[in-house]
């Protein structure tokens, strides 16, 4: 709003007076100049009111210089002075209604002090009203209560509305929502306040409309127009202007005679449109005889009619009762109640169980009587005709007997295993309408007979148990069920008689006869047997007993309980050490020997690996991890010792792994004389510190001489024996015909094999030392040991007359299998470079050949004496007796490739020709080649 300018003038006399006061120091008063402004209410803070600097005649910058400021009169500061612009502005929002209430004019006065002149200026600011408030009622809802019999024209004052604004913005008028019963009239009090009055225009009827809802509106005269409303609820009070009215003028009801006392017959209802005490209706009998009054009971408030005494159709079949209804005033109404009593079937049949034959066996024949019943009804005629029935699903039926008796008989076969007892309900029903019935309940037990054998849950069982189990351990349990009961269902378990490897099954397995738990009586060995088959019998205790069998397969699981067993080289029985030969000319990778081992376990537990555990010359030899082949890792040097000691370990892959070791002695030499010359060095002296060089030389010379002399003697004896043998064989013809191959024991030499000529020497298994057969010589490697030259027992041969021709006919020796032969190129050593078409000749001259033949004879003598550490029975392939006929390599087919013929690259195979009993192909050719070399 624009501020009004100052309308007063400053008098010159006053200015002079002020100056005079200042001069004389006399107190002074403010001048008479007054500055007035006018603003509307609700301005924002900082709104412009007036320009003080202009009205005071001062420049804006002089306001601060002269100390112009507002002097408050104790009221909250509503205005502030802007020293820069010289403008008077609002210090906050100004609410006129809060500041001046209902005053017609609202003025705010304060002074402005000019300090340098010590002069005050009065400021008067008028705050004008705006229409910022609507008329409001103190309550949101107004309740007005009017009696319905009030006459028209009656006035009812209503509370007025309040509007804090003034003037035209204040409350100006009231309006009432349109209706046909009320109008509005506005009255004014002495102070000018207007209030409304509600005027009844037409009479009210509470039964027509009990509550009238009106809306009263109060409006002011501002711009924009504001108004307030209030909901007026007019409640019409009741007046007793209506009489009770029954819902029916006449009530009819038919009731059976056997209704119990207290039964509600019907309820009469009368209504009164009035409310409160005027609408409360009470009921009572009117003009009722005393005899009838005792029969019925009427509730005066609800109108319920009940029987107070038993009704009898034969006594009274019809009642007429008059009921009156009265409200709280003088109005009443009447109605009739007609009650018809009907004859009904009020007696239920009586059912009695005369006899009950329980329990009944489940094998009882059809038609067997299990119960006898009697029925009776006190009613007569149709109401006294009684029929009996049972549920259709029961295996019984009712048969009518004489008079009022019924028999309960078996209609279908009984099975106790399906239903062990029957809860039977017999219902007796009369012919009344509605029919009455009576039920009798009893339980019939079914006795068991032994008609079900025990049954196992499975057709067959199988279980697994690790070997080496604890004795007496529970290994499995079987369970059989018998649907019979008591003794007929008591099951006894047993094992069927059987033998395992000639031993009764009962010595291996036992079973708890009550629980069916099986126990191991022995510790099982997977290597002995893998599986146990048995029959478990379950018998009940009935008479006669019934039983059933089930097969049980017990599989023994292998555990790593067997360490690897080394087949080759076999451990010697005399404590000596086996010797293998490696020529100094051997290239890297030369096959020296092969360690052959087996494991009696299976699967991973029998998977073997080889490794070199210890060597006297590290790095000289290597062992195949999976083959066991001992090969040279590098070329042999002159500085390498003649005797090399190797410790080879064989380990399986079980958990935990088991292992075995073997010590190999490898002789490094290029010729037999060199080997023989140094054989004495294979034995270590008992005490190296006390050994003497001279003693060594003497022993060496003596040993060489002994060996040379022994070889000469053996060679001469061999020549004579061969000549004698040829004569003997020619004279005997086929004397060994009919002797099976299993009667011959192959002598495969001693522990050190040399590449040279060799003769096959075979003994019959029952000949001991007395019988020798020398077939066509073949070429093989021969094992030489120190024991060979020191053997004292001579090889004994009987003359021709002592051959057991009649006991054991001689047959021609079968030619050697070609699988056991290999060419010179396949043999380790320097001879491997020769022509592979013919067998090689490692001895350089006839003398070496003769010497080797003598060694073979000595080896044959050891085999005949049973002192050979490598010789074995027939069919054992030179293995020890432990792996004889009862444990051949057929038992360990996975290790056939590991059987190694010392000194060669050949491995054992099961030739088809040998299995068929036929001579292998190429055998004759080998014999011819051998003969040619002998002639040379």
UniProtKB/Swiss-Prot annotation:
Residues that carry a glycan: 51, 423, 549
Taxonomy, superkingdom: Eukaryota
Topological domain spans for side Cytoplasmic: 718-936
Subcellular location per the Swiss-Prot or TrEMBL entry: Cell membrane
Signal peptide coordinates: 1-32
Coiled-coil regions listed in the entry: none
UniProt-annotated stretches for the region Disordered: 801-845, 906-936
GO molecular function, one term: calcium ion binding
Residue ranges with Basic residues bias: 926-936
Primary residence: membrane
GO cellular component assignments: plasma membrane
Extracellular side of membrane: 33-696
Bias type Polar residues, positions: 820-845
Protein role: Potential calcium-dependent cell-adhesion protein. May be involved in the establishment and maintenance of specific neuronal connections in the brain.
Name this polypeptide is given: Protocadherin gamma-A10
Gene: PCDHGA10
């Amino acid at each position: 709003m624009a501020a009004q300018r100052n309308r007063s003038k400053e008098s010159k006399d006053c200015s002079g007076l002020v100056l005079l006061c200042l001069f004389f120091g006399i107190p002074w008063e403010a001048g008479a100049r007054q500055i007035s402004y006018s603003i509307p209410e609700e301005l924002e803070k900082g709104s412009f009111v007036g320009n003080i600097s202009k009205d005071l005649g001062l420049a804006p910058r002089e306001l601060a210089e002269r100390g112009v400021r507002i002097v408050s009169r104790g009221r909250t500061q509503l205005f502030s002075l802007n020293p820069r612009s010289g403008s008077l502005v609002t210090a906050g929002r100004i609410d006129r209604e809060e500041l001046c209430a209902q005053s017609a004019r609202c003025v705010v006065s304060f002074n402005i002090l000019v300090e340098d002149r010590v002069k005050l200026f009065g400021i008067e600011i008028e705050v004008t009203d705006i229409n910022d408030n609507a008329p409001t009622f103190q309550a949101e809802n107004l309740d007005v209560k009017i009696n319905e019999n009030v006459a028209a024209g009656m006035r009812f004052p209503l509370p007025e509305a309040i509007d804090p604004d003034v003037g035209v913005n204040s409350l100006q008028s009231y309006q009432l929502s349109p209706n046909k019963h009320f109008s509005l009239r506005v009255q004014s009090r002495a102070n000018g306040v207007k209030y409304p009055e509600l005027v009844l225009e037409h009479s009210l009827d509470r039964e027509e409309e009990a509550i009238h809802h009106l809306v009263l509106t109060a409006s002011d005269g501002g711009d924009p127009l504001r108004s307030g409303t209030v909901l007026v609820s007019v409640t019409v009070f009741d007046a007793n202007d209506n009489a009770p009215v029954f819902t029916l003028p006449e009530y009819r009801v038919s009731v059976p005679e056997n209704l119990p006392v207290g039964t509600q017959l019907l309820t009469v209802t009368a209504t009164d449109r009035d409310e409160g005490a005027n609408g409360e209706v009470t009921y009572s009998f009117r003009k009722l005889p005393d005899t009838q009054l005792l029969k019925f009971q009427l509730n005066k408030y609800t109108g319920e009619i009940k029987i107070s005494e038993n009704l009898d159709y034969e006594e009274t079949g019809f009642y007429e009762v008059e009921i009156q209804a009265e409200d709280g005033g003088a109005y009443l109404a009447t109605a009739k109640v007609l009650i018809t009593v009907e004859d009904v079937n009020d007696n239920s049949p009586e059912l009695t169980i005369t006899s009950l034959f329980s329990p009944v066996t489940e094998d009882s024949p059809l038609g067997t009587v299990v119960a006898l019943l009697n029925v009776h009804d006190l009613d007569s005629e149709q109401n006294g005709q009684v029929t009996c029935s049972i549920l259709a699903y029961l295996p019984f039926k009712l048969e009518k007997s004489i008079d009022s008796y019924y028999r309960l008989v078996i209609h279908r076969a009984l099975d106790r295993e399906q239903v062990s007892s029957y809860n039977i309900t017999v219902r007796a029903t009369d012919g009344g309408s509605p029919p009455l019935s009576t039920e009798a309940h009893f339980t019939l037990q079914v006795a068991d007979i032994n008609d079900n054998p025990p049954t196992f849950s499975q057709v067959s069982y199988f279980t697994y148990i690790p070997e080496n189990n604890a004795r007496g351990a529970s290994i499995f349990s079987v369970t059989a069920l018998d649907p019979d009961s008591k003794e007929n269902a008591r099951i006894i378990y047993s094992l069927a008689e059987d033998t395992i490897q000639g031993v009764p099954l009962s010595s291996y397995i036992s079973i708890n006869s009550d629980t069916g738990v099986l126990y191991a009586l022995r510790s099982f060995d997977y290597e002995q047997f893998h599986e146990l088959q048995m029959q478990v019998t379950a018998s009940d205790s009935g008479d006669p007993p019934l039983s059933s069998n089930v097969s049980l397969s017990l599989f023994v699981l292998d555990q790593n309980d067997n360490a690897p067993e080394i087949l080759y080289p076999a451990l010697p029985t005399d404590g000596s050490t086996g010797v293998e030969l490696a020529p100094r000319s051997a290239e890297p990778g030369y096959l020296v020997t092969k360690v052959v081992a087996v494991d009696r376990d299976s699967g991973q537990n029998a998977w073997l690996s080889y490794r070199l555990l210890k060597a006297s010359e590290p790095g000289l030899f290597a062992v195949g991890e999976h083959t066991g082949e001992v090969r040279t890792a590098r070329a042999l040097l002159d500085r390498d010792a003649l005797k090399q000691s190797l410790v080879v370990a064989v380990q399986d892959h079980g958990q935990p792994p088991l292992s075995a070791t073997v010590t190999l002695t490898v002789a490094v030499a290029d010729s037999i004389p060199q080997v023989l010359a140094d054989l004495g060095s294979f034995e270590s002296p008992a005490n190296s510190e006390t050994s003497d060089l001279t003693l060594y030389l003497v022993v060496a010379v003596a040993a060489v001489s002994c060996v040379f002399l022994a070889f000469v003697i053996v060679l001469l004896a061999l020549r004579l024996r061969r000549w004698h043998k040829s004569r003997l064989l020619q004279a005997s013809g086929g004397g060994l015909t009919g002797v099976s191959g299993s009667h011959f024991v192959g002598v495969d030499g001693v522990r050190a094999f040399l590449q040279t000529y060799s003769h096959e020497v075979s003994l019959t298994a029952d000949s001991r030392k007395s019988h020798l057969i020398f077939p066509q010589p073949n070429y093989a490697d021969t094992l030489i040991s120190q024991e060979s030259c020191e053997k004292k027992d001579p090889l004994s041969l009987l003359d021709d007359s002592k051959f057991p021709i009649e006991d054991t006919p001689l047959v021609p020796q079968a030619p050697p299998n070609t699988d056991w032969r290999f060419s010179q190129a396949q043999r380790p050593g320097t001879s491997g470079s020769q022509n592979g078409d013919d067998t090689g000749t490692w001895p350089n001259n006839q003398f070496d050949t003769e010497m080797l033949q003598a060694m073979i004879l000595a080896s044959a003598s050891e085999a005949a004496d049973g002192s050979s550490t490598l010789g074995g029975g027939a069919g054992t392939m030179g293995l020890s007796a432990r792996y004889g006929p009862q444990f051949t390599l057929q038992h360990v087919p996975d290790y056939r490739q590991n059987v190694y013929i010392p000194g060669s690259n050949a491995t054992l195979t099961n030739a088809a020709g040998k299995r068929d009993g036929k001579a292998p192909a190429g055998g004759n050719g080998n014999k011819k080649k051998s003969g040619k070399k002998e002639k040379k």
